[in-house]
């Protein structure tokens, strides 16, 4: 799922992931961006958008952010919500996302 993201290339294929909620409902998401936060926070991050999301009246789409840990073979992993009070983590994610969007 994860890859080094050096922000100097375009994705030709969409990377998709299926999330399952507490009720067992599956939702398909597109991986918008992965962020290597191992050095600073000891974990990596992923930004997701619903795969078939349409922009709202303001031209925006809901983006979800999670920290993640891959399993040893790199095919799956565990997503964890990022605590709302993790201000330094959110600041880093916002900074990387803004740089990504400027490209």
Curated annotation (Swiss-Prot):
Matching InterPro entries: UPF0473
Highest taxon in the source lineage: Bacteria
Matches recorded under Pfam families: DUF1292
Coiled coil: none
NCBIfam families the record matches: PRK13678.1-2, PRK13678.1-4
Family: Belongs to the UPF0473 family.
Name of the protein: UPF0473 protein SGO_2040
Organism whose genome encodes this protein: Streptococcus gordonii (strain Challis / ATCC 35105 / BCRC 15272 / CH1 / DL1 / V288)
